[in-house]
């Protein structure tokens, strides 16, 4: 039996990187957290803190590169920006640890209401995942684990 010949458009789609064939989705959600920014921040920015609620394991490598391990698979990211006790952003890299155009990123921002003193965690997940319901459920579960750790 002969191998089917793919139309040119299908062949091009197979050869293009995934980032060139998909559009990214920006998902944002906020959670009230009963913990001070000073207590919460290390759980968002340090490998040991992240490993307690966010993924299986986190290793800090050279040049502020993080190796996030989910299901025994490595996902590399750079700490792109941070403000102590305020925010942290991880920009994901390819498997060779190189920057990518339109890369996935994850942004955690801690906000405190001056009026009520309530602390909020804003999660911004910019990725290929487009199912808002699935993302909401995933982040609800992860942040619930985080709340249990920080007592809030």
Where do the protein language model's features map onto the residues?
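Short, surface-exposed coil-to-beta transition loops
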Residues: 28, 73-77, 100-107
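Glycine-rich portal/gate segments that line the openings of hydrophobic small-molecule binding cavities
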Residues: 51-96
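Generic structural detector for well-ordered beta-strands
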Residues: 30-34, 67-69, 78, 109
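Hydrophobic pocket/interface hotspot
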Residues: 40-41, 50, 79, 90, ...
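Beta-strand/loop substructures that line and gate deep hydrophobic ligand-binding cavities in soluble
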Residues: 95-148, 152
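Hydrophobic ligand-binding cavity/cleft-lining segments
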Residues: 5-59
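A short, structured loop/turn motif at beta-sheet edges
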Residues: 37-38, 80-86, 110-120
């Amino acid at each position: 039996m002969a191998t089917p010949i793919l139309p040119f458009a299908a062949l091009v789609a197979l050869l293009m990187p995934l980032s060139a064939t998909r559009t990214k989705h920006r998902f944002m959600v906020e959670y009230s957290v009963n913990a001070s920014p000073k207590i919460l921040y290390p759980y968002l920015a340090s490998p040991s803190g992240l490993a307690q609620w966010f993924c299986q394991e986190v290793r800090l490598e050279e040049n502020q590169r993080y190796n996030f391990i989910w299901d025994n698979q490595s996902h590399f990211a750079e700490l792109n920006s941070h403000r102590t006790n305020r925010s942290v952003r991880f920009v994901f890299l390819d498997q060779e640890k190189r920057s990518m155009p339109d890369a996935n990123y994850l942004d955690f921002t801690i906000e405190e209401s001056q009026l009520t003193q309530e602390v909020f965690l804003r999660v911004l997940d910019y990725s290929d995942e487009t199912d808002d319901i699935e993302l909401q459920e995933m982040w609800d579960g992860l942040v619930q684990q985080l709340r249990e750790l920080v007592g809030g």
